[in-house]
């Protein structure tokens, strides 16, 4: 997921010792709290990449 890759890097920079499972939990919570209008660009980019890789 495009958004999670970007956000994961941010979390890892702030908390380099945080376990991957905890990072994933935080990312899931953050994603659920994002309003749809903020999610749409990332969803569209993920779809574009999916189609590109299928070609």
Curated annotation (Swiss-Prot):
Q: Which residues cross the membrane?
A: none
Q: Which residues bind DNA?
A: 1-55
Q: Which Pfam families match?
A: HMG_box
Q: Which GO terms describe its cellular component?
A: nucleus
Compartment annotation = Nucleus
Coiled-coil intervals, chain numbering: none
Q: Which InterPro entries match?
A: HMG_box_dom (IPR009071), HMG_box_dom_sf (IPR036910), SRY-related_HMG-box_TF-like (IPR050140)
The keyword Nucleus belongs to this UniProt entry's keyword annotation: yes
Is DNA-binding a UniProt keyword of this protein? yes
Would you tell me the protein name for this molecule? Protein SOX-19
Q: Which organism is it from?
A: Mus musculus (Mouse)
Q: What is the lineage of its organism?
A: Eukaryota, Metazoa, Chordata, Craniata, Vertebrata
Q: Which gene encodes it?
A: Sox19
